[in-house]
Structures are given as C-alpha cells and as structure tokens.
C-alpha cells in the first residue's frame, strides 16, 4: 500500500506538478511531505498527515517550515 501511494505522488510530481507554477507555501513541498509522512508513519497515518497538510495549502495560510513529526515509539 505504501509503495502504491508513494508511486501516485511520484507520478504527480513527474507528470503534473512540473507543468504548473511553484505555488507551495511550505517547505518541504506538500508532495515531498506526503512521501516522507507515508515512509515514516505508514500508509494510513501518513496519508492522514499528507491530507491535513494539503488542506492548509491555501492563500489564507502563511505557510513556512512544516516538517513531518517524528514517529512515537
């Protein structure tokens, strides 16, 4: 499941994102954040974190640095 989700993000990065203007308000970008979140926290929680992050990416949010939280042991 993780590989499939990450593969979808990579397809977006390669075939869609590169043809649109850079508008991400965050560092790392939302797609890079999504990949890291899924790799760190697994498919379910990583997807939740990625969707939560993407929902904040709009003109009324100031953006900035927003890193994937570390996995709790």
Swiss-Prot record:
Membrane topology: Peripheral membrane protein
Record key words, sorted: Cell membrane, Membrane
Cellular compartment(s): Cell membrane
Pfam families assigned to the protein according to its UniProt record, in alphabetical order: YidD
Chief localisation class: membrane
Keyword Transmembrane among UniProt keywords: no
InterPro entries found in the cross-reference section: Membr_insert_effic_factor_YidD
Function: Could be involved in insertion of integral membrane proteins into the membrane.
HAMAP family in UniProt: UPF0161_YidD
Family to which this protein belongs: Belongs to the UPF0161 family.
Stated name of the protein: Putative membrane protein insertion efficiency factor
Protein species of origin: Listeria welshimeri serovar 6b (strain ATCC 35897 / DSM 20650 / CCUG 15529 / CIP 8149 / NCTC 11857 / SLCC 5334 / V8)
Origin organism lineage: Bacteria, Bacillati, Bacillota, Bacilli, Bacillales
């Amino acid at each position: 499941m993780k590989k499939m989700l990450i593969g979808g993000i990579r397809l977006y990065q390669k075939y869609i994102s590169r043809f649109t203007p850079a508008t991400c308000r965050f560092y790392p970008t939302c797609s890079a954040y999504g990949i890291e979140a899924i790799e760190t926290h697994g498919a379910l929680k990583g997807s939740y974190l990625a969707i939560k992050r993407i929902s904040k990416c709009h003109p009324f949010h100031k953006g900035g640095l927003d890193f994937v939280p570390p996995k709790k042991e």
